[in-house]
A protein has these predicted regions:
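Generic alpha-helical transmembrane segments
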Residues: 145-151
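Membrane-helix boundary/interface segments in integral membrane proteins
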Residues: 153-163
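Alpha-helical transmembrane segments and their membrane-interface boundaries
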Residues: 3-52, 56-131, 135-143, 166-189
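Forkhead-associated
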Residues: 54, 152-153
Length: 189
């Protein structure tokens, strides 16, 4: 169990993780939209859906109403701003061949990995907090919700972009994040 004196330190760490994950997933969503040649609104929507969609799905499944996304708009603002900034950069560059370069796909993979890593921890923490408030559940609920939080936005991004979700195509990634949720639970229980 975490000593009570460390609560604020861990709270700060989780806020930083949420912000880092939000920026990473917003970049991932915006890059997918740019690759699909969407306009500015499409880029912003795909960026916000990717960054905030997993938490929205988690909150709906946990029965949280209104969902966190609608209470604290900071993460929507961060993801929309990040997506718009990326759109502007690519609009200024005006080089359609950039999305076909290796570094572009590598950056997409890296931002996905950062977002997944951050949100699997955040998803587990939020679920544990809800269980402390009286939600019935066990380790499987925590692991499932952590996984949904981590992969939900990316799944929605890929569905909106008319692609098979990456999480279903790369089995090793989904397995590692599922196991990471177990690890987080046992580390703090």
């Amino acid at each position: 169990m975490i000593p009570k004196g460390y609560y604020y330190m861990f709270n700060t760490v989780f806020i930083i993780l949420e912000i880092v994950g939000t920026i990473a997933f917003a970049i991932s969503g915006a890059m997918t939209a740019i690759n699909r040649r969407l306009d500015a609104l499409g880029v912003i929507i795909l960026g916000v859906v990717t960054a905030c969609g997993g938490g929205l799905l988690r909150d709906i499944m946990l029965g949280v109403f209104p969902q966190s996304l609608f209470i604290d708009s900071l993460y929507v603002i961060i993801s929309a701003s990040t997506s718009l900034l990326l759109f502007i950069v690519f609009y200024i560059i005006k080089d359609d061949s950039l999305t076909e370069k290796k570094w572009y796909n590598d950056l997409l993979t890296i931002t996905d990995a950062i977002g997944l890593g951050a949100f699997v921890v955040v998803g587990a923490d939020v679920t544990i907090s809800k269980m402390a408030e009286g939600l019935n559940g066990n380790v499987f609920l925590i692991v499932f919700m952590a996984t949904i939080t981590a992969v939900g936005g990316g799944m929605l991004r890929d569905i909106f972009a008319a692609k098979v979700p990456n999480i279903f195509c790369n089995k090793s990634i989904s397995t590692w994040y599922f196991l990471s949720a177990f690890k987080f639970f046992f580390a703090f229980s």
